[in-house]
Amino acid sequence: DSIPLMAILFKPFHSILPEDFQYIGIYLLLCQLLQTWMAWLLLGAMSIHKPGARLAGTLILGLAPVWFFRWVHPALCSHYVLIGALWIYMGSRKTESLSPWIWRQLLILWISAYTHPYLGGMTLALTFAWLLRLWLVDKRWQAWQSLVGFPIAASIILLNWWVIGYFGVSSEGMGTVGLGEYTLNILSFFDSLNSYSTFVPSLPHMPKQYEGFAYLGLGGILLLLMTLVLRFRAKEKGVLHGLWPLWAFCGLMAVYAMSTDIYVGEFRLLKYSWADFIEEKAQVFRATGRFVWPLYYLVL
């Protein structure tokens, strides 16, 4: 896939660049730097200020296995927009003025539209979660403000997709190959696919479920278990208060990621059907397993 963001940036220099010039390496480095920076900001927004803890958390998020797994598909390495959207969700609750955060959210939306359609769709969903939080949790916005925000956010994504030319591709050209196959396995958070862990073996999965790769890493798994124990013992709401809109949207995306055949390893736990109009629209995002990424970073 192309990376419209980089193509537009380098277009003015086309006449002076060599014929074999490519920006893949530049963009991968940029993604790594931005992902690390967004992770640092996110942890600060979560009141993690001790340098050692914040640095460790930044490294875990910045060097996430799910990001390295996408190196063969550079346009999909733009996970910094997802972590950036999480930062806005967490950080905006601490400030009196929402104006700077609104502009940041608009910027994240705009950038995501120029990276990859999958990431644009995920970022839009995270924006919807933020708008719900402002209305239903923080009570900082009235209902009409958030309800107006939904179409505005969607328009930013759709308008920029139209500018790029995504709507010039017919659905016939997209086909249905992979729909219901490139999915998320329930065990994906613990499945290293053999290549991403020295200690954790690959778990059973269906042949094409690599698109739902979501391995947390051994450190991430241990931290998740420790966090669950500590949260069970804790009585205060703390920083997790007000996360239900985020969990709801990330959970819905994870359900979509599993598609209509839900597997635990190689065992099919559940099979159901989508309505025809949903299946028709889902052809655009037929590698549904990728939609686990927002939940992945939320869990991590």
Predicted segments with their positions:
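Hydrophobic/aromatic-rich transmembrane helices and adjacent perimembrane loops
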Residues: L218, L270-L300
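Membrane-interface helix-loop-helix junctions at transmembrane boundaries of multi-pass membrane enzymes
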Residues: D138-L147, L224-L269
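Membrane-interface coil-to-helix junctions
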Residues: D1-L34, A64, H73, S78, ...
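Periplasmic/ER-lumenal interhelical loops and adjacent helix-loop junctions
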Residues: A154-R231
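Hydrophobic alpha-helical transmembrane segments
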Residues: S2, M6, P18, Q22-W37, ...
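Hydrophobic alpha-helical membrane-interfacial segments at the cytosolic entry of transmembrane helices
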Residues: K139-I164, T176-E181, W244-L252
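Membrane-embedded helix bundles of polyisoprenyl
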Residues: L29, L33-M46, P51-R93, L98-L134, ...
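Membrane-interface helix-loop junctions at the exits of transmembrane helices
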Residues: L55-V72, L159-V169, I186-S197, W247-V284
